Amino acid sequence: MNSVSPAAAQYRSSSPEDARRRPEARRPRGPRGPDPNGLGPSGASGPALGSPGAGPSEPDEVDKFKAKFLTAWNNVKYGWVVKSRTSFSKISSIHLCGRRYRFEGEGDIQRFQRDFVSRLWLTYRRDFPPLPGGCLTSDCGWGCMLRSGQMMLAQGLLLHFLPRDWTWAEGMGLGPPELSGSASPSRYHGPARWMPPRWAQGAPELEQERRHRQIVSWFADHPRAPFGLHRLVELGQSSGKKAGDWYGPSLVAHILRKAVESCSDVTRLVVYVSQDCTVYKADVARLVARPDPTAEWKSVVILVPVRLGGETLNPVYVPCVKELLRCELCLGIMGGKPRHSLYFIGYQDDFLLYLDPHYCQPTVDVSQADFPLESFHCTSPRKMAFAKMDPSCTVGFYAGDRKEFETLCSELTRVLSSSSATERYPMFTLAEGHAQDHSLDDLCSQLAQPTLRLPRTGRLLRAKRPSSEDFVFL
């Protein structure tokens, strides 16, 4: 998919000419060490970028060239985009992850910056170990929906393990955003500089930073990372997907559910994926309940795959989308533009605020004690018009306990019922009971509606004259 990627000045990328010069370019496919020139093993883009009918050695060089070309193109494109300014209205409120900000003073701007830069940003990577089932060492060009799903799950984990007002203390190197009508507008001047840990902080802050690093490490591009790309691709194989394929938002929701189920490090969190745009409360309750009825419920991430129109977004859904993004328990929306996934986390006026995964960065070795964190946090807010939003997306929510789940249900009922006044169909629905019960009820109701009533006879093969009472005309 056509996408955007990092500024070429910041991240080194190899030129296509390097692929032609290297003598090892025609070695057979298979696991091998990291590529010192920057793009990994020579089969890095086999399934994703084509040449399925080529011989056993030639695709190695061809795919390597294609991978390098695609990464270089992404670098150039992102380098152009990042130079453009993103302006925000100084008059209108901006909603980010359920919080409202008004740029009325310098303090408001700093609070917004601190909140935005604290969200985890998971992007294309290169030079990681080969993905399952092939030799791909980069997801550049095809893994954006998986990355958007990772960001949504990461936001849920931040809410699960850290206080709701937690912010990344080291991320305040952000330049203020452009404000329309501001007396002294400012521009984004590049990524925040990496700062060493603040050892003078108290024990709670240090523990939060340790947890922050642990959450980041769970998304590392390594086969052992529970929510890393390798694990997600492995789980997608049961659905017929492989590395290099396009993943839709609904499929990614189920992959995330399986990943959390199989993670031994996250025992008090479960993921529920709705069926047919319906959240069944009893199914959620059964999922989060413990054997001891008096024990606390587990926390839950609720993922709701929806379609908000035909080929394009139906504008009648925009007010409802805004209402959901204002909800504090909303994790955002995994969607984007057609064939271009983005992670929406807020809005201002008629524009969505998003994190873009199309930023091809080198893989980070998270096994180091103080691995750098700056590439996991975005410092440049971006926005997109609602009209460009792809109608196929997945909305996420988080409830930490039973009380929060009840609060969430009340809030969703209010939002969905108020929006349905102008919509023929709501975005999704909440229902009591279990999905299985509703399926059986629907089946029974269909069977209970007769289209033809045969006369009762006391003897088989006994003819009877039909009358108007023996048939039901629909």
UniProtKB/Swiss-Prot annotation:
Residues 15-27 have a biased composition (Basic and acidic residues). Its EC number is 3.4.22.-. Cleaved by CASP3 during apoptosis which leads to increased activity. The cleavage by CASP3 reveals a cryptic mitochondrial targeting sequence immediately downstream of their canonical caspase cleavage sites which leads to mitochondrial import of the protein. Keywords: Apoptosis, Autophagy, Cytoplasm, Hydrolase, Mitochondrion, Phosphoprotein, Protease, Protein transport, Thiol protease, Transport, Ubl conjugation pathway. The keyword Transport applies. GO terms for biological process: aggrephagy; apoptotic process; autophagosome assembly; autophagy; mitophagy; piecemeal microautophagy of the nucleus; protein delipidation; protein localization to phagophore assembly site. Widely expressed in testis. It comes from the Eukaryota. GO terms for cellular component: cytoplasm; mitochondrial matrix; mitochondrion; nucleoplasm. Changing residue 63 to A: Abolishes cleavage by CASP3. This is Cysteine protease ATG4D. It comes from Homo sapiens. The gene is ATG4D.
